[in-house]
Amino acid sequence: MVRVDQNLFNEVMYLLDELSQDITVPKNVRKVAQDSKAKLSQENESLDLRCATVLSMLDEMANDPNVPAHGRTDLYTIISKLEALSKS
């Protein structure tokens, strides 16, 4: 992985960790953030596949009407960084 990619990967992992510990978002969002972090950590699959899987999981949560506005903003931030990571 190129250094820029590694920095972006670390940033995504940090944001997912922050989201998983945010008690102001519903429990299902925190669970998906934890699952997403675990999925991204599995190095036995290609990065593109891991990113696509996590993007799907996060997109489903972003469309949940029970997610507060700030939680949705966090999800969209992570989604955009993941899309950039998968294209690099």
Swiss-Prot record:
Q: Which Pfam families match?
A: UPF0147
The UniProt entry, under InterPro entries, shows: Ta0600-like_sf (IPR023130), UPF0147 (IPR005354)
Q: Which residues cross the membrane?
A: none
Describe the family membership recorded for this protein in Swiss-Prot or TrEMBL: Belongs to the UPF0147 family.
Q: What is this protein called?
A: UPF0147 protein Ta0600
Which source organism?
Thermoplasma acidophilum (strain ATCC 25905 / DSM 1728 / JCM 9062 / NBRC 15155 / AMRC-C165)
